[in-house]
Amino acid sequence: MKKAVLLATVFCGVVGLTSCCRIVDCCFEDPCAPKPCNPCGNKKDKGCSPCGVYTPSCSKPCGSECNPGVQGPQAKGCTSLDGRCKQ
């Protein structure tokens, strides 16, 4: 019985993590992105997995995984020499 409960808990935890937007995955501000590019704002884009795939990077256009037309300052390659985002 304990094994069944443990397996159910693990399974539900894994499914839950992959099917929803976790705060640790994407609910943060990309310092290089305009407000519309906040990944939590469009975490459930059609045809795209949940926003766990979002990786904030100044060198990558915001929303490129789901919306190729959405671009922010990242599209201009605004990274500094040390790889951090320019303000």
From Swiss-Prot:
On modification after translation, the UniProt record reads: N-terminal amide-linked and S-diacylglycerol cysteine-linked to 16:0, 18:0, 15:0 branched, and 17:0 branched fatty acids (ratio 6:5:3:4) in the EB stage. The exact distribution of fatty acids has not been determined.
Record note on quaternary structure: Part of a disulfide cross-linked outer membrane complex (COMC) composed of the major outer membrane porin (MOMP), the small cysteine-rich protein (omcA) and the large cysteine-rich periplasmic protein (omcB).
Q: Name one GO molecular function term.
A: extracellular matrix structural constituent
Which species is this UniProt entry from? Chlamydia psittaci (Chlamydophila psittaci)
What's the protein here called? Answer: Small cysteine-rich outer membrane protein omcA
Extent of the signal sequence: 1-19
Recorded topology in the membrane: Lipid-anchor
Record's keyword terms, sorted: Cell outer membrane, Cell shape, Disulfide bond, Lipoprotein, Membrane, Palmitate, Signal
Write down the Pfam families for this protein, in alphabetical order: Chlam_OMP3
Any one cellular component term from GO for this entry?
cell outer membrane
